[in-house]
Amino acid sequence: MKNIGRWILAVTGISLAQLLSAQQIPEVRMVDIPAGSFYMGGEGAGEDYDELPIHKVNITHPFKMSMTEITNAQFEAFRPEHKALRGKNGLSLEDDEAVVYVSYADVVAFCEWLSRKEGKHYRLPTEAEWEYACRAGTYYLYNTGDGLPEAYRKNQQTARDLKPVSLKVGQTPPNAFGLCDMHGNVEEWCLDWYGPYLPSEQNDPAGRTTDDFRVTRGGSHNTPDKYLRSGNRMAMIPEDKHAQTGFRIVESAFTPVATVAPVLPPANQQEVNQTNYTWKVVKDPVFKAPVPYVLQPEPDSGNPFFSHNHQPAITWCDNGDLLAIWFSADEENGRGMVVLASRLRAGTEQWDRSSLFFKVPDRNMTGSALLNDRQGTLYHLNGVEASGDWQNLMMVMRTSRDNGQTWSAPQIIAPEHAKRHQVIAGTIRTREGWLIQPCDAGPGSHDGAAIHISKDGGKTWQDPWDGKPLPEFKEGNTGSTIAGIHAGVVQLKDGSLMALARGNSILNKEGKLRMPMSISKDMGKTWTYYASEFPPIDGGQRLVFMRLNEGPLLLISFTDHPLRTPEAERGMIFPDREGNNYRGYGLYAAVSYDEGKTWPVRRLLTDGITRFLDGGAWTKHFLMDATHAEPRGYMAATQSPDNLIHLVSSRLYYCFNLAWITDGQHIPDNSF
């Protein structure tokens, strides 16, 4: 008998401890769900566009579904080591609370294990089975009616810091099918790959044949009520795991088969030329009139587009195109935020209309960056929240080797939903070939900035932070976090890093607050803080700090904040072509030829022609003329191999070059 036991252990690979614990799994109570038909979907207004079209679904087979979500005790009979995650972030501590911090692979493995153990066929519910079981014959917002009774409510609001609540299962009244906790408690993994609904009547749909995201349903604690609706759709990157998602299971002899082809690519990924562009350096001064790159999609295109379009990134492509991305949302802290894109195709003068670029359904997507590494690869990095807000983001990365026509599946490069992960446009490649990604260190205006470094082309990333709290940001002090948010980072000739940023302003020797400058000589482990010579910027403004192809450093920033800077301190002095000085206001460029020690060249970003423009986002309308440039905006820039500088604000695209910035100005003898 002992030999038989050893043979079983050897063949299955199951340890004795796992075998013993498997015999002690608490009962998973199952409820009979009859076959039937229902109408799936919802009104599809605004961010809920993916709930359309409403369509008839026939569930042709009866099945059993677990009355509640799987608990810690039940899951840990399969994975005892998961017990180490109990109570993380103050949630799901007890045996009878819903298990969380489980990936899609984790829950599929549990179903396979339980199937082997009991000789039955367990799996996840399809999205259609889940909604059918949740509705239980109802068509209200919730199976309880138009609203949620108090028994279901567990801090149902957007929560920057998750409020500890009980996730004990079975505490809500059962619906008409006998299921508890279908609204809230924790989100629940479903079997399907996510994708748009089809309009036709369907039998036993099981989603797309492939996609980047797996469906979740039901909503959770610490999120607004609307995400708990019967018809609300969500999804996650399969490898993601966090405190707001668990699962329940189905027992059925029926095996769903996904038959719907993947979604066609969006417009920004269609008809992309794959011929390498022949770049010719432009030596004459160039300044092109600003034009909008955020253009509303055609009404029948199926692309989402919301009222607030902001926080862009931009890169050049090897085929000569420019690719710009930004977030679109009605609420900056909302779960409906999407990342849109537009392409300025080589040889054309007008940007394409906006189309969807990246969206993990019902997750806040704050923070995007793009980089052409000049080695044939485009990098896209993005933040992804567990739900709403932008404090607890994980970081993901995608790559393209064909000018953005196709992208790799999102790779999670910083898996914890935590601070220091809010991606900022301005990814750089160092002389060592390392990638450096700046990120905000927290959600506030004075939380400083972090960097993440990859030494292997994006496979692995590390934040060199030592875990210490923010230091006092003052001249000469040191710390392990960059002073200011929305930082731009460059590598200096000696290999050190320099950063300029917004907020955490530093007093200079004259007692004036200046834009903070941070310098690190150990690749971001330690930063020394200085007051730069530039005025600080404020809300609705983001700078660009980069090294130009020609060698100098370029800063693009604002002379002041049009509403928050005291009137007497607004504007900066600029030289004109006749050698006289004038006071200008708004967006400017400054150039340094000595690694940031001095900035002898400064120019207001206007050609002097009067224009009435719409800057979008927080900028809105403004007047550009000889002494006024764009007053606010989140800036991002790239420089293509022809040495043209491509700058975007929250809505407008500018194109100019170093020759235009320096035209008519005194250039130091030691310039590049």
Task: Give, region by region, the residue ranges found by the protein language model.
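Disulfide-stabilized, aromatic/cysteine-rich ligand-recognition loop
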Residues: 24, 167, 173-175, 208-267
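Functional-site microenvironments in short loops/helix caps that host divalent-cation chemistry
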Residues: 33, 39, 43-47, 85, ...
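Asp-box/BNR beta-propeller blade signature and adjacent active/binding-site loops
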Residues: 258-672
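Bacterial N-terminal signal peptides that target proteins for export
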Residues: 1-9
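Residues that flank catalytic or metal-binding motifs in active/ligand-binding sites
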Residues: 26-29, 34, 53-55, 59-61, ...
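A short glycine-rich, aromatic-capped structural motif
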Residues: 24-86, 105, 184
